C-alpha cells in the first residue's frame, strides 16, 4: 500500500459493514414541520431486530447502502439521511411493527411525485432483511405541497362549471367496455345522458383499439353529449380517456377533446404514470378541462395487507399530481372497501385539513393548505337499492357511477338513467327533510318507485343482488 493511500484511509474512514441502527435509528429525533413523515408496516426476517429493520427502511430509502463508503465523508449525512424515529408493535401480531421514518425535504425534487415515490417506495421494498413492507401513510408538509399545482380545478370550480349543486353527481361507465363501434358507443352515451345522468365514462382500458379508434369515439361522444344537453337543458360530460402509449399522444388526444368543446377528459394515472398524469393535469388547468382519474392497477399495489402501499397514499399522491375525480371504492358494491378506512381517504381527498385518526387508518394530521379537493367516485356493482347508503356515506361531494346499474335496466339505457336519477333525487330530498337514510332508505326508494315506472322496474331486477364479502383492508 502506498503512503498516499494510507493517508487517505487514516482520515476517519473505516471500511466494512455496520448495523443500520447505529446511524439511522434515532428515537431521540424531534420531527420538523418540513419533514415528510412515513408510516411503514414492517415484517422483519426471523432474527432481525425491529430497530435494525426500521433503520434499514430509513437508510435504503434515503442515503444508505449496504456498506460504508468513503464518499459519506464528502457530505453531511445528518442533514440528508432518513431517520427511523419511532417503532410500535402491531397489536395481535408477533413480528409486525409500524416504523415511523422522517425524511428531510431536501431529498426530493419540487413538484415531482415520481421522484418522491422513487425514494420512499423504491428498492427498499425488495430488501432481503425484510419479509414484507407496506407504506401505510405519508405526511406531506405544506412546504412541499406548495410546489405542486394539484387538481386542475377542484370541487367548487367543477360545480360552478356544471351549474350543479346540492347533490352527488351521477355517472355511468359504458358497457360492454370493449367491442362496440364508435357510433354504437356514442348512441349509448346519448341515451344515458338524456335519461338524467350528469356523466358517462370510457372504461379504463378503452384507448384506441381496432374496433374503435380514439378519434372516432371522441367525435361520436361529443355529438351525443351536445344532443343530450340540447334536449335536457343540463350541462353533460363524457370522460374521454386520453391515456396513450406516449405523453405526446396523450396530450394530442386532450387537445382534440378541447377542440370538440367537451368539458372533461380522463387518465389511468397508475398505468399511465405520475409524470404523464401531472403533465395532463397542467394542460387541463390551462385549457379549462376537468380531469377524471381511474385507478386501474391499484389493487396490485394496495390489496395485500402486509406488503405494498395503502390506497390512502396513492390518493394523496393523486391530489398532488392532479385530478378532479378519482375512483375510491363504494363500501357497499362489488369492490374492496371497508367503511371507516374508505371514509378516511375520502376525507384526505376532499378536505383542507384532516386530523390524525388511527381508527380510520390516518396516521398523521394532514394540512393541504387550500389545495383544491378531489371528488371521490363510487363505482363497481352498485344499483338503485344502494342509493340511500351511498348518499348517506359520501354526502353531496361525490360522483356515484352506475355502469351495469344503468345499462342493465330491462327497458334500456335511458330508463336505467331515469331510475337512478329519480332514486338519487328521492334520497337527497328525504335527507334534507331529516329522514334517516340508514333506517328508512329502502322505504324511501319504494315510495319513489310508486311514481316512477322506470325505478320500479329497476327495483324488481336488483332486489336480491348483494356483494357480502368481508373486506381485506382493515385497520
UniProtKB/Swiss-Prot annotation:
It comes from the Eukaryota. One of its GO terms (molecular function) is monooxygenase activity. Binds 1 Mg(2+) ion per subunit. It is found in: Plastid, Chloroplast. Mg(2+) binds at residues 201, 203-204. Signal peptide: none annotated. Its EC number is 4.1.1.39. The disulfide bond which can form in the large chain dimeric partners within the hexadecamer appears to be associated with oxidative stress and protein turnover. It catalyses: 2 (2R)-3-phosphoglycerate + 2 H(+) = D-ribulose 1,5-bisphosphate + CO2 + H2O; D-ribulose 1,5-bisphosphate + O2 = 2-phosphoglycolate + (2R)-3-phosphoglycerate + 2 H(+). Residues 1-2 form a propeptide. The active site is at residues 175, 294. Keywords: Acetylation, Calvin cycle, Carbon dioxide fixation, Chloroplast, Disulfide bond, Lyase, Magnesium, Metal-binding, Monooxygenase, Oxidoreductase, Photorespiration, Photosynthesis, Plastid. NCBIfam families: PRK04208.1 (NF003252). PANTHER family: RIBULOSE BISPHOSPHATE CARBOXYLASE, RIBULOSE BISPHOSPHATE CARBOXYLASE LARGE CHAIN. This is Ribulose bisphosphate carboxylase large chain. It comes from Gnetum parvifolium. The lineage of its organism: Eukaryota, Viridiplantae, Streptophyta, Embryophyta, Tracheophyta.
